[in-house]
Amino acid sequence: METMPNWLMQRAFLTPDRTAIEIEEEKVTFMQLHEKVVSVCEHLTHIGVKRGQKVAVLMKNGMEMITVIHALSYVGAVAVLLNTRLSREELLWQMDDAEVICLVTDQDFDAKDIPVYSFAEVMNGPKEEASIQEEFSLEEAMTIIYTSGTTGKPKGVILTYGNHWASAVGSSLNLGLRDDDCWLACMPMFHVGGLSLLMKNIMYGMRILLVPKYDADFIHKALQTRGVTIISVVSKMLTDLLERLGAETYPSSLRCMLLGGGPAPKPLLETCVEKGIPVYQTYGMTETSSQICTLSADYMLTKVGSAGKPLFQCQLRIEKDGVVVPAFTEGEIVVKGPNVTGGYFNREDATRETIQNGWLHTGDIGYLDEEGFLYVLDRRSDLIISGGENIYPAQIEEVLLSHPAVAEAGVVGMTDDKWGQVPVAFVVKSGEVTEEEIIHFCEAKLAKYKVPKKACFLEELPRNASKKLLRRELRQLVEEM
């Protein structure tokens, strides 16, 4: 069993006085962060959190969430990170599925069957001596993060200490490390992209400027004045920043804008080239512990639309019907590497289907060019990506079909200037219902960003001979709107 020293403890020992986290005007060193985490450990131990248990975390970006995530690793518990944008029903389902023993949150949340502890309540309560892991076993689970399959049923992706370590090492070999590096973190830490920055923070000994809530004005100013060298963004954020930049440019110390969440439009990249902003396009998912492919800024315009090549310790190929296909042939993107999950929690069926001989079948469609650069054509074909958030049509359709006046439902994405895409519903009625009623019904059951922006009524939905819904025909209807 391969082990490593407890990451934050080791970092606090090696560089105790180096700044770890900056939030607004607060600065915390690695030693101070370690001390805060030990305190949280002692409070969590008092409420009964033990090694091997799963604890749900529903918190916004901030020092509190950082200390809870690290404290759970200190006691050897598994952090089940919940998306704060989900509805109560969705959150309860995930907590039940993950078999959590309790929820730690900074929000008002009522759950009948699961003990709920507010962070303030935990920290104001008694302490108890904690049994702290001085070593991490790389095979052990560290986090569970839920992702939805095209079926719409979320699956808990198990990421081990080894997965997170490999992800951080792969990123450092790709982007390099500098003593003056500062990564601006504006992605939610319940997403693997945000969480991966916490890992890099303690492994690299790198300063992180944490933005509690997405604020384009603050981020724009921080890039100009706070010594930021790297930032992770999605296209929507990049567009917001360019609007604020106007005719100016960012300091040359900004060496990398890591762009994820789907391919970027060419005009956006051309503007970045004009302004000397180095954009690195990436491809990754929860199952790969963040990025697995990156296109360096050198190729921004010669390989427009490409997600680049795999990280050093990763492999990637394109398969069709189980056979590896040559360059420029479309097929399924299949990946392998030490950062790739070993499977889904309590879902042996999905694990067997997705991971074969160590290769993860992503369900995404793409091709490689003659030099091995990846081009992603469709992210899980039916997926809607709205403001960097994944929306699975099947989940919305399930909600629509639970309405008594809805006989059939189909959902596709519609292009939106602000969010990239937004969901649109097509409905066959079985009784009297209005568009407004349908949207209101969805608002009660879905996260706000998943609620259809339009509901259109049809006599029947387009289907093939085997009665499978033809989403491409619904997309054509959207284009004609």
Curated annotation (Swiss-Prot):
Keyword ATP-binding among record annotations: yes
Listed GO MF terms: ATP binding; o-succinylbenzoate-CoA ligase activity
InterPro entries in the cross-refs: AMP-bd_C, AMP-bd_C_sf, AMP-binding_CS, AMP-dep_synth/lig_dom, ANL_N_sf, MenE
Reactions performed catalytically: 2-succinylbenzoate + ATP + CoA = 2-succinylbenzoyl-CoA + AMP + diphosphate
Domain of life: Bacteria
EC number(s) on file: 6.2.1.26
Pfam families: AMP-binding, AMP-binding_C
Pathway assigned in UniProt: Quinol/quinone metabolism; 1,4-dihydroxy-2-naphthoate biosynthesis; 1,4-dihydroxy-2-naphthoate from chorismate: step 5/7; Quinol/quinone metabolism; menaquinone biosynthesis
Entries under PANTHER family matching the protein: AMP-BINDING DOMAIN-CONTAINING PROTEIN-RELATED, LONG-CHAIN-FATTY-ACID--COA LIGASE
Name under which the protein is recorded: 2-succinylbenzoate--CoA ligase
Species of the source: Bacillus cereus (strain ATCC 10987 / NRS 248)
Lineage: Bacteria, Bacillati, Bacillota, Bacilli, Bacillales
Gene, per the UniProt record: menE
